[in-house]
Regions:
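Metal-dependent amide/peptide-bond hydrolase catalytic core
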Residues: 25, 29-36, 219-228, 232-235, ...
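Acidic/histidine-rich catalytic neighborhood of metal-dependent amide-processing enzymes
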Residues: 147-148, 154-231
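N-terminal secretory signal peptides that target proteins for export/translocation
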Residues: 1-8
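Acidic/His- and Gly-rich active-site-bordering loop/insert found
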Residues: 29-151, 170-179, 356
Length: 487
């Protein structure tokens, strides 16, 4: 064989060996990718069984009426306890007042050294419903056209079942945990948060100095073809409820009085309505809007990509006041929610009143905002006072944590190409109560929903797609194992 032929042969052999090596590496990488998450280790038949349980347990749980008021969350606690007892999982029920209870359960870590626990928090109470406006009874647990209907289907019995199922899976699959995983179902979130407040006051040690908490508040909106974004609740606005009272001359309704209390109240409320709190751009809002830019018309998309410049644009400032979402994200907001005056049509009262629902951005001073409103009204015959002296300052969690990184990583796996972005809620949730305890608390929802499905929360025909129930628990399982399990 010629030297040239030998060289060619050696070159060909080299290429062959290199190719085989690359194929082996590719196969190894593929195998690694396929087993990147703990759910990949579960046989498909068992995943199918878990998916069946998700639907079955959801139907049973949705049939339990925990309307608040009065709550009766003890019914939900008993439902959870029966399942947890059957699985041999440590749990305790605390009936802190008749019919109202919290349930705590724990999977202890199995690996040392252990890190701080992760809490799965959900509330068992739901808001009221009017059955006459529903397609099916709100507590029937009925499946119609591939949707499971029920009060709590979006807020948040659906997530409570995901939390429960993940806890069960961790136990059954014998996942090696280097954190305690705590399942916590509480009462009265929809009204006064007495369940969480009681637990922290009387059983705080059961939280085990937790590092992370996953709660409601996340929002993952999809259209017919794709998931538009994965929204993680990292902060909420704080409610400042105000009582406005106008004083004036009383008299007979047949003789109009220019300086009557109702007239003074109307003038005061018109001044409040005309007042536009200035824009305040929070970093989490800036990141959220930037992620929304691809879904917006060109002009708005340009603003969302450069919000620090947009907030100085007069046209955008006006849009931020007109657009409901931009308004709550960028401003302190004021809603007139209640009005009162005379008990009789022909009596001009000496007092007329209104209630305002004010929502303040994180970092805002309630006393300063109250003084601003008093200056806006500028009438010594009109008083504005807080309805309660108990003001809970708004707070938010850092996105520079292992849990937030896990949410990003898992979401990229299940929803490739979809942005994961922090969110600021217009309302409030119990994350605000847990963050001051040193816990990184996030609202993360493992399910996706169309805007219409999401809007059924607290509305008529609240529902969730059955397919979401069968899929979402796996997303949460991989998030939890990413921060609590040892590979």
């Amino acid at each position: 064989m010629s030297q040239r032929g030998l060289v060619v042969c050696r070159f060909t052999l080299c290429l062959l060996l290199t190719g085989l090596s690359l194929l082996g590496a590719a196969g190894q990488n593929k195998s690694t990718r396929e087993r990147e998450f703990f759910s990949d280790r579960i046989p498909s038949d068992r995943l199918q069984q878990y998916a069946d349980l998700a639907v079955q347990w959801s139907q049973k749980y949705f049939r339990i009426d925990t309307t608040n008021p009065p709550g009766n969350e003890m019914r939900g606690a008993v439902f959870f306890k029966e399942i947890l007892d059957a699985e041999g999982i440590e749990n305790r029920v605390f009936e802190y007042t008749p019919g109202r209870a919290d349930l705590w359960a724990r999977l202890p870590h199995t690996i040392e050294p252990a890190r701080r626990p992760v809490v799965l928090l959900n509330h068992m109470d739901v808001v009221t419903s009017d059955p006459s406006h529903w397609k099916v009874p709100p507590f029937s647990g009925a499946i119609v056209d591939d949707y499971l209907y029920g009060r709590g289907a979006q807020d948040m019995k659906n997530e409570g079942i995901a939390h429960l199922l993940v806890t069960i899976m961790l136990r059954r699959e014998k996942v090696p945990l280097d954190r305690d995983v705590i399942f916590l179902a509480v009462s009265d979130e929809e009204v006064d948060s007495t369940g969480t407040e009681w637990l922290i006051a009387h059983q705080r040690d059961l939280l085990g100095n937790a590092e992370f908490l996953i709660n409601e508040g996340g929002m993952n909106i999809r259209d017919n073809t794709r998931v538009k974004y994965i929204g993680v609740d990292v902060g909420e606005k704080s409610p400042l409820w105000l009582h406005v009272v106008a004083h004036g001359r009383p008299g007979h309704g047949s003789v109009p009085l220019a300086d009557s209390a109702p007239n003074r109240l109307i003038v005061a409320l018109n001044r409040i309505r005309a007042y536009h709190p200035p824009i305040k751009l929070l970093p989490i809002v800036e990141e959220f809007l930037r992620a929304q830019a691809p879904n917006e018309p060109p002009a708005r998309a340009a603003h969302f990509r450069n919000m620090r410049q947009a907030i100085w644009d007069k046209n955008f400032q006006r849009e931020s006041e007109r657009n409901e979402t931009l308004n709550y994200l960028l401003h302190n907001t004021i809603s007139i929610t209640m009005l009162g005056g005379s008990a009789q049509t022909n009596v001009i009262p000496s007092e007329a009143w209104a209630n305002l629902d004010v929502r303040l951005l994180p970092g805002e001073d309630p006393k300063q905002f109250l003084e601003t409103l008093r200056r806006v009204v500028n009438d010594p015959n009109v008083t504005i006072e807080p309805q309660s002296s108990d003001f809970r300052p708004a707070n938010y969690a850092s996105t520079d944590t292992a849990l937030y990184a896990a949410i990003r990583r898992v979401s990229a796996h299940y929803f490739p190409g979809t942005p994961v972005t922090p969110m600021l809620l217009s309302g409030t949730d119990e994350n605000q109560i847990y963050r001051p305890l040193g816990i990184h608390a996030y609202g993360f929802n493992p399910y996706t929903a169309t805007q219409e499905e999401n809007d059924s929360e607290h509305g008529d025909d609240e529902r969730i797609r059955v397919e979401e129930l069968r899929r979402g628990f796996r997303v949460l399982y991989d998030v939890v194992t990413s921060v609590a399990a040892k590979k």
